[in-house]
Amino acid sequence: MDFTTMTMASNMATSTTTTATSAHASINSSSNFNIDIDSNQNTPSILINNNSDSSNGKNTDFNGVNNIHQKNIMNNTNNVHLYSPNIMDQTLLTPQDIAKLRRESIAHSQGMGGVSWGSISVGSWLRDEIISRRNSIVPASANGAASAAASATTTATNTLQIQQPTKRPSVSNPPYHRGYSISPQIAYTAYLPNLEKQYCKDYSCCGLSLPGLHDLLRHYEEAHISTSPNTTNMSQIPMNSAGNTSSSVRMTNNTSSANYNLQNNMAANTKNAGHKTNTMQAHSSNATNNTSINNMHANLQSNMDSNSTIRQSQHPHHQQNIIQQQLQSNSVNHTSGAVPTPSVMGSATASSTTANPNVISITGAPNSGLSMANHSQQLHLNGNLVDAVSTNDVFLRTSNSPSRHVPHNKQINSNNNSGININNNTSHNSNINMGSKNAMVNRPHTFNNYSLNKTSRNPIQHQSRKIDPHQTDLSPLVLVQDIDLSFMDDDILGPSNHNSMNSVVNPTTGSHNYNTFHSSVHAKSSQNMVEDQDIDDIDDDDDVDDDDDDDDDDDTENGSSSNGKSVHNNNYKMPQQAYIDDPARRLYVMDHEEQKPFKCPVIGCEKTYKNQNGLKYHRLHGHQNQKLHENPDGTFSVIDPDSTDSFGDGMGSAKDKPYRCEVCGKRYKNLNGLKYHRGHSTH
């Protein structure tokens, strides 16, 4: 029994020895590598960081291998630092890597902050891409040292296995770009331009093809800015222009059938006792009783080619602002018709002259009884009581065509359907004399020439007012509280060769004396239509735009009389105000001003546009929440709501847009706009 036990123990020892012999023999030396020798195949392999043997697929665990690796590599300075997380924590973490962990702050400091897609910021993304492409090439020294170490310790059949970290870059893990990278090797310096060129292009909006981001921004500002519901859109006003040549001015009110009295008008529209009210009165040479024209409206029934027609219209948004007028002696019955326009405002009196009882003229009436709904406010400007004009009322009408001349002794017949009741006894056909050849409709001469108020060279001659709310070939002498805005379209179309007509304005009383607004009533006579066609042919030769630059032909007037009245003259030049400090930079601005020749004529507004449509849109919506003051010389200034003082040239934009580009002088409301301008401009 003892013999049997000894035999079994001997067999177990033999099997144990055999197992140990067939197993892998581990050789641990003071070198940098651990070599496992396979007893079956005699194929040594270098194992780093406890990897499995690739030649035979058997796993071998050695206790303390990582510690031996770390100790040997740290002691030998000639060894190549192969990737191991424990080693990298101590040797390859540089201050630049630590700073990269704070890449959001770095990106903001370099001006790339604020732009992101989701949780990925543009600054960190671009910085990572640039650094990765710059360090995408593996250093040649690392490859050479690793191959030399491998060849010194292994044979031709040996394999070298290198383990790379499998975690994302962090404090404990070095970033990828410090070693091997699979990023494409392209020029990282051209990355930003290529990115902008690839993505910031080919926009499409409203059926328009917008090639660049600037074009998209301009289109958005011109077409997609929300406007006030009180804004008049002139394109929505219909106009009858086919065949019907009988033009009539009807006294109607489409919104109410009740008669308006003077007391209701004063109670609804007068805010304080100091506010002045205006009236429109019609006088006849045969009677002394004054009758008022109730809610004038012009049926737009003449051809587009007719050069002289009294036209008035109103957008539905302005129905609440209908001009209400009271009969002073006799009542006028209300008839159905179109909605009257609020543009016929201010002090206007239709009277007939002694020379010709059929001549219709509109003159100033300082003491009037017509009240307007929310159209005039009075402010104390520099100690004087002046009228403030809302911009919504100023930029209402427009026209593109040059004015027309009417020859001497031209008379147009009008039938009973004309609807102009100058007196209750007037029901017969009337001949309306259109005045002499000296009574011409004035057109402002140049761009910054704001001759709004005009008087005739011959004050005895009285002409009637012409109003055209559409983009027709008629002269736009549109008045909003006695303010003519046709100068804006004249600046666009260029100067014309008409005689100047001046007006006298008293800023202390707010009264305006209009003696020369020339117009005609188009009749249905075919003979008159032929004559109008002849007039159009004559005027086409006269209304030729000058080739000179509008900015070089700006006129100004500095003289004033002792009683506070200022007379505007077209023979003076207004200097162009420079808004940049450096004269050298001003040359740059002058060179680029040709690209945007259309400038807003309001003093204190620096808006310029490349085309006419941009200025038209700005006229309607650019000064929505501002008040404009009419200066004695006929210009407009933006009123400061805080101090009720008018802004000087450039002062309004400096307050609303405090951030200014020092090179070109452009101003922006916030700093982001200025940053975008600096990043995308050529200067």
From Swiss-Prot:
<feature type="zinc finger region" description="C2H2-type 2">
    <location>
        <begin position="659"/>
        <end position="683"/>
    </location>
</feature>
<keyword id="KW-0677">Repeat</keyword>
<feature type="region of interest" description="Disordered">
    <location>
        <begin position="535"/>
        <end position="573"/>
    </location>
</feature>
<keyword id="KW-0597">Phosphoprotein</keyword>
<keyword id="KW-0805">Transcription regulation</keyword>
<comment type="subunit">
    <text>Interacts with the target of rapamycin complex 1 (TORC1) in a rapamycin-dependent manner. Interacts with MRS6.</text>
</comment>
<feature type="region of interest" description="Disordered">
    <location>
        <begin position="399"/>
        <end position="420"/>
    </location>
</feature>
<feature type="region of interest" description="Disordered">
    <location>
        <begin position="498"/>
        <end position="517"/>
    </location>
</feature>
<feature type="compositionally biased region" description="Polar residues">
    <location>
        <begin position="160"/>
        <end position="173"/>
    </location>
</feature>
<dbReference type="GO" id="GO:0003677">
    <property type="term" value="F:DNA binding"/>
</dbReference>
<feature type="region of interest" description="Prion domain (PrD)">
    <location>
        <begin position="230"/>
        <end position="458"/>
    </location>
</feature>
<feature type="region of interest" description="Disordered">
    <location>
        <begin position="332"/>
        <end position="357"/>
    </location>
</feature>
<keyword id="KW-0238">DNA-binding</keyword>
<keyword id="KW-0863">Zinc-finger</keyword>
<protein>
    <recommendedName>
        <fullName>Transcription factor SFP1</fullName>
    </recommendedName>
</protein>
<feature type="compositionally biased region" description="Polar residues">
    <location>
        <begin position="558"/>
        <end position="573"/>
    </location>
</feature>
<feature type="compositionally biased region" description="Acidic residues">
    <location>
        <begin position="535"/>
        <end position="557"/>
    </location>
</feature>
<dbReference type="GO" id="GO:0045944">
    <property type="term" value="P:positive regulation of transcription by RNA polymerase II"/>
</dbReference>
<comment type="function">
    <text>Transcription factor that regulates ribosomal protein (RP) and ribosome biogenesis (Ribi) gene expression in response to nutrients and stress. Promotes RP gene expression under optimal growth conditions. Leaves the nucleus upon environmental challenges, resulting in a down-regulation of RP gene transcription. The effect of the environmental cues on SFP1 localization is mediated through the TOR pathway. Also regulates the expression of genes involved in the G2/M transition during the mitotic cell cycle and the DNA-damage response. Required for carbon-source modulation of cell size.</text>
</comment>
<dbReference type="InterPro" id="IPR013087">
    <property type="entry name" value="Znf_C2H2_type"/>
</dbReference>
<dbReference type="InterPro" id="IPR051580">
    <property type="entry name" value="ZnF-Chromatin_assoc"/>
</dbReference>
<keyword id="KW-0963">Cytoplasm</keyword>
<dbReference type="GO" id="GO:0060963">
    <property type="term" value="P:positive regulation of ribosomal protein gene transcription by RNA polymerase II"/>
</dbReference>
<dbReference type="GO" id="GO:0005737">
    <property type="term" value="C:cytoplasm"/>
</dbReference>
<keyword id="KW-0862">Zinc</keyword>
<dbReference type="InterPro" id="IPR036236">
    <property type="entry name" value="Znf_C2H2_sf"/>
</dbReference>
<feature type="region of interest" description="Disordered">
    <location>
        <begin position="305"/>
        <end position="324"/>
    </location>
</feature>
<keyword id="KW-0539">Nucleus</keyword>
<keyword id="KW-0804">Transcription</keyword>
<dbReference type="GO" id="GO:0005634">
    <property type="term" value="C:nucleus"/>
</dbReference>
<dbReference type="GO" id="GO:0008361">
    <property type="term" value="P:regulation of cell size"/>
</dbReference>
<feature type="region of interest" description="Disordered">
    <location>
        <begin position="156"/>
        <end position="178"/>
    </location>
</feature>
<dbReference type="GO" id="GO:0008270">
    <property type="term" value="F:zinc ion binding"/>
</dbReference>
<keyword id="KW-0479">Metal-binding</keyword>
<keyword id="KW-0346">Stress response</keyword>
<keyword id="KW-0034">Amyloid</keyword>
<keyword id="KW-0640">Prion</keyword>
<dbReference type="GO" id="GO:0000981">
    <property type="term" value="F:DNA-binding transcription factor activity, RNA polymerase II-specific"/>
</dbReference>
<feature type="zinc finger region" description="C2H2-type 1">
    <location>
        <begin position="598"/>
        <end position="623"/>
    </location>
</feature>
